[in-house]
UniProtKB/Swiss-Prot annotation:
HAMAP family: QueC. ATP binds at residues 10-20. This is 7-cyano-7-deazaguanine synthase. SUPFAM superfamilies: Adenine nucleotide alpha hydrolases-like. Binds 1 zinc ion per subunit. It comes from Bacillus mycoides (strain KBAB4) (Bacillus weihenstephanensis).
Length: 220
């Protein structure tokens, strides 16, 4: 364990909660930051608050509602359908979201004396989001270091693993049941296994089913 402090970009979903448990094992002190950008389901923020409280993690919520003014999308607007047409970005993509989130997380991290930032972005299950790519994160890391003259390190524990491997990681961290029962991934705002129909739920379930099959096979 590093005797240092980390800030986790935290939404209360499967990926960021797995990253939170990862950070707790990696760093002596961990804080979480959640962004309120008027997302479709306010339950996401409530979920993040409850998880942080249960784990005894200091938790900051930042108002990023300006994102909805700049880039209306299906994650913030109930009148927009969740779609993903071939050759186009998904309607759930929010222009500049991870750029802004990581930048503000870095400002917060510096203020609280942390140089490590942890985020659950992932290129393996790449959903067409350009701001989930490794090259983007590495580029932004350099930019943030230059902009604040501060040695930030952005950690992406999930970058090269798929959803099944993310479930495996949560199991290795002793957090499998916690993540399965208490996180919110569903675009329709249903905690745990979700609605089973939206793209996020389908990806989560496919990964879970694959991992459970692998785990069962390994135990036989």
């Amino acid at each position: 364990m590093k005797k240092e402090k980390a800030v986790v970009v935290f939404s209360g979903g499967q990926d960021s909660t797995t990253c939170l448990f990862w950070a707790i094992q990696q760093f002596e002190e961990v804080e979480a930051v959640t962004f309120n950008y008027n997302q479709r389901h306010k339950l996401e923020i409530d979920c993040a608050v409850e998880i942080a409280k249960e784990l005894g993690i200091k938790h900051t919520i930042l108002d990023m509602s300006l994102l909805n003014q700049l880039a209306p999308n299906a994650l913030t607007r109930t009148d927009m359908e969740i779609t993903h047409e071939e050759g186009e970005l998904p309607s759930t993509f929010v222009d500049g979201r991870n750029l802004l989130f990581l930048s503000f997380a870095a400002v917060l991290a510096k203020q609280v004396g942390a140089r490590h930032i942890v985020t659950g972005v992932c290129e393996t299950d790449f959903s067409g989001y350009p701001d989930c790519r490794d090259v983007f994160v590495k580029s932004l890391n350099v930019t943030l270091n230059l902009s604040m003259d501060y040695p930030f390190v952005i950690h992406t524990p999930l970058m090269w693993i798929d959803k099944a491997e993310t479930w495996k990681l949560s199991d290795e961290l002793g957090a499998f049941e916690f993540v399965r029962e208490k996180t919110l991934t569903c675009y329709n705002g249903i905690i745990g296994d979700g609605c089973g129909e939206c793209p996020a739920c389908q990806l989560r379930k496919a990964g879970l089913d694959t991992y459970l099959q692998e785990r069962e096979g390994a135990s036989n």
